[in-house]
Curated annotation (Swiss-Prot):
Protein name: Small ribosomal subunit protein bS16
Single GO molecular function: structural constituent of ribosome
A biological-process GO annotation: translation
Disulfide bridge map: none
Keyword Iron-sulfur: no
Keywords: Ribonucleoprotein, Ribosomal protein
HAMAP family assigned to the protein according to its UniProt record, in alphabetical order: Ribosomal_bS16 (MF_00385)
SUPFAM superfamilies in the record: Ribosomal protein S16
One Gene Ontology cellular component: small ribosomal subunit
């Protein structure tokens, strides 16, 4: 089972709000997911992001692949740097 970390669209028309979910890559965008690990609100000036960093790092260590947009969000939040440092510090 290929697992991806990706965005699920919530909110109303013209006012999107996203949850950052861990899901099977074969499930639809807004369909079944395994776990919610954060939120992303692009409408706020500073693009409000909340993350459960420990859970994101756990999923990345277990082989979950982030989507392109989630990869950019994790990079801006510094999570990918922590993951890279923990992976190659051995």
């Amino acid at each position: 089972m290929a697992v991806k970390i990706r965005l699920t669209r919530m909110g109303s028309k013209k006012k999107p709000f996203y949850r950052i979910n861990v899901a099977d890559s074969r499930s639809p965008r807004d369909g079944r997911f395994i776990e919610t690990v954060g939120t992303y609100n692009p409408l706020v000036a500073e693009n409000q992001v909340t993350l459960k960093e420990d859970r994101v790092l756990t999923w990345l260590a277990n082989g979950a692949q982030p989507s392109d947009t989630v990869r950019n969000i994790l990079s801006k939040e510094g999570v990918l740097k922590k993951f890279h440092d923990s992976k190659f510090s051995k």
